[in-house]
């Protein structure tokens, strides 16, 4: 895949970026270079390579999933103008 001048101008317009003719021409070469690098990456054989999310192996600490009220219901509704049993009361908007 390659990028032409019209594509650069269209992307700049969609991104609301002001680009003059010289900058757009320079970006054509830069974007084509980036796309060429991505195409090289897609040619690499990664069969059998385990996916990784970090360069260092680590595992997230697990905790039990407990349902609680958070013990902050009163603090949350403290500044609300209308409440009832720790629920916000709002005006009816749909009949």
UniProtKB/Swiss-Prot annotation:
GO annotation (BP), single: glutaminyl-tRNAGln biosynthesis via transamidation
Protein name: Aspartyl/glutamyl-tRNA(Asn/Gln) amidotransferase subunit C
Function per UniProt: Allows the formation of correctly charged Asn-tRNA(Asn) or Gln-tRNA(Gln) through the transamidation of misacylated Asp-tRNA(Asn) or Glu-tRNA(Gln) in organisms which lack either or both of asparaginyl-tRNA or glutaminyl-tRNA synthetases. The reaction takes place in the presence of glutamine and ATP through an activated phospho-Asp-tRNA(Asn) or phospho-Glu-tRNA(Gln).
Residues passing through the membrane, by range: none
Organism from which the protein derives: Rhizobium rhizogenes (strain K84 / ATCC BAA-868)
HAMAP family linked to this entry: GatC (MF_00122)
Subunit details: Heterotrimer of A, B and C subunits.
EC number: 6.3.5.-
Keywords: ATP-binding, Ligase, Nucleotide-binding, Protein biosynthesis
Gene3D superfamilies attached to this UniProt entry: Glu-tRNAGln amidotransferase C subunit, N-terminal domain (1.10.20.60)
PANTHER family: GLUTAMYL-TRNA(GLN) AMIDOTRANSFERASE SUBUNIT C, MITOCHONDRIAL
Catalytic activity: L-glutamyl-tRNA(Gln) + L-glutamine + ATP + H2O = L-glutaminyl-tRNA(Gln) + L-glutamate + ADP + phosphate + H(+); L-aspartyl-tRNA(Asn) + L-glutamine + ATP + H2O = L-asparaginyl-tRNA(Asn) + L-glutamate + ADP + phosphate + 2 H(+)
Top-rank taxon, per record: Bacteria
Sequence similarity: Belongs to the GatC family.
GO MF assignments: asparaginyl-tRNA synthase (glutamine-hydrolyzing) activity; ATP binding; glutaminyl-tRNA synthase (glutamine-hydrolyzing) activity
Enzyme class (EC, first level): ligase
């Amino acid at each position: 895949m390659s990028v032409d001048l019209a594509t650069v101008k269209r992307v700049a317009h969609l991104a609301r970026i002001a680009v003059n003719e010289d900058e757009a021409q320079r970006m054509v070469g830069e974007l084509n270079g980036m796309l060429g690098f991505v195409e090289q990456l897609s040619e690499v054989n990664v069969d059998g390579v385990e996916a990784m999310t970090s360069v260092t192996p680590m595992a997230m600490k697990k905790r039990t999933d407990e349902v609680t009220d958070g013990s902050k219901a009163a603090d949350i509704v403290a500044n609300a103008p209308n409440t009832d049993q720790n629920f916000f009361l709002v005006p009816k908007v749909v009949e």
